């Protein structure tokens, strides 16, 4: 079973605002970042960090923490950010290591869904489409469905998906 996005919380503007406001807004050593975030949000590095990393809210590279935002953001900014990041979100994501053994190269999920719908206009079941694309059962479906609802090209209604006009 593949989890295209972690299950901690849904990728909503409100949750992105909470994550960004909790993260340090300046570059620092990975060690300082871990100490700072654990003091501010005990347990952050156990699960919440996954969603923050999956959404590109920060990166740690060569021992240096770099935040996406240098300031707190509001829900309008978070919504715009989610609308942008959903267009570039790929599977498998390095922060969701379970599953995805059948995928030879990463897929940009929104683009792959659009291409699938264009080629198979009678197929509308989102979970089935994602399962076909990732070549296994979809884990955390409600989380990926919520994330994809940020798309400006996909219309998601209950369990179905179509292209927006």
Language-model region placement:
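Donor-sugar nucleotide-binding helix/loop cap in glycosyltransferases
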Residues: 1-165
